[in-house]
Amino acid sequence: MAQRPPGVGGAIVRQVSGHERCPLLFLDVDGPLLPFGGSGQSGRGDTDVAPHLSRLRVEAGPRLAELPCTLVWATTWLEDANSEIAPWLGLPNLPVVTWPEPTEAQEREDQWLGLCWKTRAVVDWAAGRPFAWVDDEITEADREWVSSHHPAPAMLWRVDASRGLTDRDFADLGEWLRQLT
């Protein structure tokens, strides 16, 4: 079996305790769906694709739609993910996490702990529901913080930003999500 690069993937997983609601999947765009490496070719094969979308992994759309979860954008694209990304992926409009300004105390604590700036907002948005979060900025500090601040199962999955979501990522996410449903 091939080894994952250090720090890529990984999860914090806890047992489900009678929590029956559909899990959430928080999805970043830049990195997981728009890798920073690669050929720069659109998966659609369109010649008139906007340059910033030329690396979009359109084959990920149907695979995301098949996962047993509620998809939620967790990206700086905000609502633009619904107008510019979702149609290329064949996805409907999805809920979007908004990014509130942290307090000065939160910002200092996040820097001291090494938390991704999205972590608190993702946990707040989940509101106690099980969730998976796919992002290229997740660290072990985020996994530890979520483990101690979120009561439900959570899987924080770091994607290699140069490759985007891979077959193995989809297999591991799907397996984890199916265990919850």
What are these regions (language model features)?
Residues 7-10:
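Residue-identity detector for glycine
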Residues 14-108, 178:
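Alpha-helical substrate-recognition element adjacent to the catalytic core
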Residues 84-181:
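C-terminal cap/substrate-recognition subdomain and adjoining C-terminal extension
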